[in-house]
Regions:
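Coupling/hinge elements of helicase-like and P-loop NTPase modules
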Residues: 1-9, 94-106
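Conserved motor-region signature of P-loop NTPase helicases/translocases
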Residues: 1-68, 155-165
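A short secondary-structure junction motif
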Residues: 58, 93, 97, 148-152
Length: 173
């Protein structure tokens, strides 16, 4: 078996989606490109992207993609119209959406007081997480984010086997 074979001549089969993370991590560690057929990559699953977006916000709150993903998940009552207004203001003032939220009292966005309170609560939560992240390790801060945002509770409310799988994915991460 001294033949040198190309990576695209190999396949890795696994029985359950929960096994994909270990395989993906090993391949990533070795810088081996891979494709998932018939399933979704562990890191492409919605619940994983949501949690990673929260964690990205702790490192860099100006990442628009992460902020837009989590600003209303779980449901904070911040709708698409509000997000559009924030995006327009961010473009107008050449600031990030996060900076617009931080300076909401200085900008007239025609947002009602209830929505302003929800945005303030969201901002305060992210700022608290950033402070906590300074003294906690990665596992502890991820656990805190999951508990305080009630991500798992939101996933569990479906009560379906898919919901159980999603909760397991979050716990795996």
């Amino acid at each position: 078996m001294n033949q040198h074979m190309k990576n695209d001549e190999f396949a890795v089969l696994y029985r359950t989606n929960s096994q994909s993370r270990a395989i993906e991590d090993a391949l990533r560690k070795k810088n081996i490109d891979y494709k998932i057929y018939g399933g979704i990559s562990f890191y492409q699953r919605k619940e994983i992207k949501d949690l990673l977006s929260y964690l990205r916000m702790l490192i860099n709150p100006n990442v628009e993609e992460a902020l837009k993903r989590i600003i209303n998940y779980p449901a904070w009552g911040i709708g698409a119209t509000t997000i559009d207004k924030l995006t327009i203001a961010a473009n107008h003032y050449n600031k990030s959406i996060f900076k617009i939220i931080k300076n909401l009292d200085k900008i007239d966005l025609k947002i009602n007081s209830g929505t302003k309170n929800k945005l303030q609560n969201f901002l305060n939560m992210i700022l608290r997480f950033q402070i906590d992240a300074q003294k906690l390790n990665a596992f502890e801060i991820a656990d805190l984010v999951v508990k305080q945002t009630q991500l798992v509770k939101d996933l569990e409310k479906d009560g379906t086997p898919e919901a159980v799988s999603k909760v397991e994915n979050v716990q795996e991460l």
